[in-house]
């Protein structure tokens, strides 16, 4: 029995630490995503010259709100599922789901980053002037929401690495072709 414990790919001492880090990161994602949603949805500014600007006027912000909602919901479900005995052994499920969430967070963050770039710099080639001088408070709140979204993304990137470690540590390391040839020869 002791030989089995010694040859296990993941030592039992790492599991509680890894599980604690995993759960902590998932729990951190929830308030970060909720704060991102709240900052974005309540963001609006009225300008006497150009009119009212709301988050719903910009598709990239709506996309970020949707992805933030999905990430908060997924993080909550994943925290609960990580303590359910029958789902704990589903390392592939967490691996694939964490990868998907990380990619979705990257795409939504990139969409908002593009909006902010155009809002701050404009695009003279297509006659778009910068807008943040007229809507400074709106741009500042979007910046803050994007920063919170980026922190949630960092949590998912670490979670993706942890779940990849869990999945791939279940398998033996690859054998080099020389070792295979030597084994066949003997």
From Swiss-Prot:
Keywords per UniProt: Cell membrane, Glycoprotein, Membrane, Transmembrane, Transmembrane helix
Cell membrane found in the keyword field: yes
Location in the cell: Cell membrane
Xref: Pfam families: CASP_dom (PF04535)
Glycosylation sites: 57
InterPro entries: CASP/CASPL, CASP_dom
One GO CC annotation: plasma membrane
Transmembrane segments annotated in the record for this chain: 21-41, 64-84, 100-120, 144-164
Membrane side Cytoplasmic: residue ranges: 1-20, 85-99, 165-186
Extracellular side: 42-63, 121-143
PANTHER family referenced in this protein's UniProt entry, alphabetically: CASP-LIKE PROTEIN 2C1-RELATED, CASP-LIKE PROTEIN 4A4
Membership in a protein family: Belongs to the Casparian strip membrane proteins (CASP) family.
Subunit structure as annotated in this protein's UniProt entry: Homodimer and heterodimers.
NCBIfam families: A_tha_TIGR01569
Protein name: CASP-like protein 2D1
């Amino acid at each position: 029995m002791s030989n089995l414990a010694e040859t296990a790919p993941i030592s039992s001492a790492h599991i509680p630490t890894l599980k604690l880090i995993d759960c902590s990161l998932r729990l951190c994602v929830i308030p970060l995503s909720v704060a991102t949603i709240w900052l974005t949805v309540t963001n609006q500014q009225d300008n006497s010259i150009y009119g009212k600007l709301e988050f719903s006027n910009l598709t990239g912000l709506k996309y970020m709100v949707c992805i933030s909602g999905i990430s908060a919901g997924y993080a909550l479900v994943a925290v609960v599922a990580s303590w359910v005995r029958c789902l704990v052994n589903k390392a592939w499920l967490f691996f694939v789901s964490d990868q998907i969430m990380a990619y979705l967070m990257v795409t939504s963050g990139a969409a908002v980053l593009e909006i902010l770039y155009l809002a701050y710099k404009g695009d003279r080639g297509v006659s778009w002037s910068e807008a943040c001088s007229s809507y400074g408070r709106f741009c500042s709140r979007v910046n803050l929401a994007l920063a919170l979204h980026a922190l949630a993304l960092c949590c998912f990137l670490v979670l993706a690495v942890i779940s990849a470690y869990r999945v791939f540590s279940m398998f033996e390391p690859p054998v080099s072709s020389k070792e295979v040839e030597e084994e066949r020869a003997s």
